From Swiss-Prot:
Family matches, as Pfam families: Zn_ribbon_RPAB4
Name of the protein this chain belongs to: DNA-directed RNA polymerase subunit Rpo12
Function: DNA-dependent RNA polymerase (RNAP) catalyzes the transcription of DNA into RNA using the four ribonucleoside triphosphates as substrates.
Species of provenance: Pyrococcus abyssi (strain GE5 / Orsay)
Free-text remark on how the cofactor is bound: Binds 1 zinc ion.
Subunit annotation: Part of the RNA polymerase complex.
Residues at which Zn(2+) binds: C11, C27, C30
Reaction equation(s) it catalyzes: RNA(n) + a ribonucleoside 5'-triphosphate = RNA(n+1) + diphosphate
Localization: Cytoplasm
Signal peptide: none
NCBIfam families, per database record: PRK00398.1-4
């Protein structure tokens, strides 16, 4: 069971999709095919040279 969280570009809702069951990525609320992976809220620190 591989579950991933995506954000719909059209309606803005967060959607949990089980990738082991389906390969069709669509928003179940509005039917949009454009989904984004949300970025983590933790800021990254990059060491400057």
């Amino acid at each position: 069971m591989v579950e991933a969280i995506y954000r719909c570009a059209k309606c803005g809702r967060e959607v949990k999709i089980d990738l082991s069951v389906t390969r069709d990525l669509r928003c179940p609320y509005c039917g949009s095919k454009i989904l984004y992976k949300p970025r983590p809220k933790v800021p990254r620190r990059v060491k400057a040279i």
